[in-house]
Amino acid sequence: MRYKVLALDLDGTLTNTEKVITPRTKAALQEAARRGVCIVLASGRPTVGIEPLARELELEKYGGCILSYNGGKIIDCRTGQTLVQHAFPADLIEPVCTFSRYWNVVPLTYDKNGIVTEVPDAPYVLEEARINKIPVRKVENLPAEVTYPINKLLLTGDPADMPHVEELMQQEFAGKLSICRSAPFFIETMPLGVGKDTSLEILLRAKGLTPANLMACGDGWNDLPMICLAGMGVAMGNAQPPVKAAANYLTADNDHDGVGLAVEKFILNEET
């Protein structure tokens, strides 16, 4: 079997617009897992927001992994062991929050229970809470509150403003942070050099594998690096144009079993 690791973005990829895994896709993934494929749920979501889908796919039984915080952390679902961990630079939390306030975007991070932010009723903070089914805790000063290690800061704001904000942020924190959008209203900020691709490379090496053994499916800007890394990069029918351009294969959209169809084709049927 050529593809021994299968990395899947969640929102816009694995799940449909109702945030549900469709039956055909679920069946294809469980059969792939039974055949020994390591399924990696690779998302910008916090770990707690990925765990329900991991349980639904029985990844603890088959030895799959959770890649959370856009590559900030990887956990082995069977053992609970943390395989990869990247901490956000503590000295950059205050500058990122100051930048965010100036440009009228709302930063958030996470604790063991849910979201932590200064503006709990901001619309895209509430969207992040809805996606992950986690509570929001209000704090007066986010940098002062974060006295524990975090994996990322997420900036939320109006989709019309975010391309410009991302560009400015890339300039402001060049050489200090990895920055990308995961949705029109989200900007991910991670430790420098961290992404889905770099953490997947660590996982592959630990398994004695190479990117040629990786199949990755995604739709968003933050999926582009892992799509480029993978021996088989699959873009969803609803993917952003750069993802489609970089992919080896274009599948159906996330409402029409795009992941399931690709898994059937390249893993279960081993087409080339």
PLM ranges: what are they?
Residues 36-40, 64, 152, 212-213, ...:
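Short active-site oxyanion
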Residues 23-124:
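Active-site phosphate-binding/coordination module
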Residues 1-5, 22, 188-272:
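Mg2+-dependent phosphoryl-transfer enzymes with acidic/Ser/Thr/Gly-rich catalytic loops
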Residues 25, 50-54, 165, 169, ...:
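Hydrophobic packing residues within well-ordered alpha-helices of enzyme cores
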Residues 2-18:
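Asp-based phosphoryl-transfer active-site loop
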Residues 57, 62, 70, 173-175, ...:
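Short, structured coil segments at secondary-structure junctions
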Residues 99, 103-217, 221, 229:
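Conserved acidic, metal-coordinating active-site core of Asp-based
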